[in-house]
Amino acid sequence: MNTHLSHLKSMFLQGTVSDLLYSVKKDYCSHPSLKNNQLVLTTQSGLPEISADPERLIQVVTNLISNAERHTQNGTITISLTGEPGWQTICVSDTGTGMSEEMRKNALKGYISADKDYWRHGIGLYVCHQIITAHGGKIWLKSKEGEGTQVFFSLPEEES
């Protein structure tokens, strides 16, 4: 675990992940950058609170929405929250341009390319990866060129 992220375990989310996502959606919908995209949020009810740094979770979700809106026009960006025993999973999906197989494989590694947009995309996902793993979680993505992207991350309900 990175030293500068090691303090995350001591932070606590006040409220549920669902509450945090509703707040992010409300704040993000006021941004003029949505490019005529619809931002949709679906959450599973009854999920317990988790131990997490809310500022870092907001950073991750906001970055994922920003990536989605940058690659989607006149489409839909969906944030979903689901739970299974011991874990809560957030997915930010879009109906945008999607990624090539090479880009998808390297996105979480912080791969830097000469392509300016690819560099920005890869570094942002790398930072998200670092934050989620510092919380004891995992992050992965699915994407296909021309069909959009889904970025998932799961967080443990109990501290690991």
Indicate where each model-derived feature is located.
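Conserved catalytic submotifs in the C-terminal HATPase_c
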Residues: L13-Q14, Q38-P48
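Short beta-strand/loop element within the Bergerat-fold HATPase_c
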Residues: T76-G86
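Short alpha-helical Gxxx[C/S/T] motif in the catalytic ATP-binding
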Residues: G124, C128
